[in-house]
Design a protein with these regions (language model features):
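Conserved structural core of kinase catalytic domains
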Residues: 63-124
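ATP-binding glycine-rich loop module of kinase domains
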Residues: 4, 11-80
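Conserved C-terminal C-lobe helix
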Residues: 342-353
């Protein structure tokens, strides 16, 4: 069976099934898919392998929740049918990296939910949310943040099991926190545990900045919090604030409560939280508490002090993203949350402690 392109929408690669073999004399079984990456995405590939290793080594039942990278190798352009994969079709690279993973037959989360038409739709959506939150808790236990928990990165199987995929921009928080304490640390420290002999052309460097350590954040922070964007609903206020500090500021620059609250208000507005009746009062209270406990507390202090405070809350980041998805799922089936779920939503969005 020849491999066919099944997803060309990814920013960093195209997915083929049953896959592209590392050795042209071999075949890849239908239980696997492969993602073909451009050689320009070196750090993304190595990072996904490193995170995948940590998941496989520390979560015994990982296959029930995640589809991490199982193997990786170089592939030759001659062995790849470009299809509609733009970066292959345009030949922006002559060498490509293939990452092998379990093939998950199903639909992206919101597409799956859109097809629910029976009276049990609410119960099914609530169950999906519970399962996603359980998966997030398993990542939290090993200090990993997925960081891109959106609909396309959760595939729901025919049996109704959500499987989380794509760990390309995920974070090993042990390394991130260590990088703040000790300076730059390789995000890919555990990569050596998976054989990379066939993809030796990859350079694991994650630094984009050349400034001295006195004027710039550690390269790992620059890599992890790679963009400041208040439009991305998957990210909570804490992440967006950290991204603002890392991308727009320097460690010893002074940040003000006005700057902090302006970012807070923009995020609330762009997420349209205040127009959701069941969240309106909670948003008002959240703003009061955020101003008191964050903006006023860290008014006129060095950026690095606020960053150190926010980074410790990383266990809430993916739960926030999962809750945003829960809200979107409820909107898909045109239902409001029950009173019990309202309280859970408000808590998991971080609107109350």
């Amino acid at each position: 069976m020849s491999a066919k392109l099944i997803n060309n929408s990814g920013t960093f690669g195209c997915i083929y099934h049953p896959g592209i073999p590392c050795n042209p004399n071999e075949t890849v079984g239908p239980e696997y898919a492969t993602k073909i990456h451009s050689n320009t995405n070196q750090s993304i590939v190595l990072n996904e392998i490193a995170i995948s290793n940590k998941i496989k080594e520390n979560i015994p039942d990982y296959a029930d929740y995640f589809s991490p990278v199982l193997d990786a190798c170089k592939v030759n352009l001659a062995n790849v049918d470009a299809g509609n994969c733009k970066f292959i079709k345009n030949k922006t690279s002559v060498q490509f990296v293939s990452t092998k993973m379990k093939f998950i037959k199903g639909h992206a989360l919101l597409k799956h939910v859109k097809q629910l038409t029976n009276m049990k739709a609410y119960k099914e959506v609530a169950t999906l949310y519970d399962k996603i939150c359980l998966a997030v808790e398993k990542l939290n236990q090993i200090h990993v943040v997925h960081f891109d928990l959106k609909s396309d990165n959760i595939i729901v199987t025919k049996s109704g099991t959500p499987i989380i995929i794509d760990f390309g921009i995920s974070m090993d928080m042990d390394n991130v926190i260590a990088s703040i304490d000790k300076g730059s640390v390789s995000k890919n420290a555990s990569v050596s545990k998976l054989s990379l002999s066939n993809i030796s052309m990859i350079n694991p460097s994650v630094s984009r900045k050349s400034e001295s350590s006195l004027s710039a954040f550690p390269p790992l922070l620059d890599y992890s919090f790679y963009t400041y964007n208040t439009d991305y609903s998957t990210w909570c206020v804490d992440i967006i604030l950290i991204s603002f500090i890392v991308q727009k500021q320097k460690p010893m620059d002074i940040i003000t409560s006005t700057q902090i609250m302006n970012i807070f208000d923009e995020v609330m507005r762009k997420n349209n939280f205040a127009n959701k009746k069941y969240l309106k009062d909670a948003v008002v209270l959240y703003r009061v508490n955020f101003k008191l406990n964050v903006a006023d507390k860290f008014n006129n202090v060095e950026n690095v002090k606020l960053l150190n405070h926010l980074i410790t809350k990383y266990r809430k980041w993916d739960i926030y993203s999962a809750t945003i998805l829960f809200i979107k799922m409820l909107e898909q089936i045109k239902q409001f949350p029950s009173d019990a779920h309202k309280e859970i939503i408000i808590h998991n969005l971080g609107f109350v402690e």
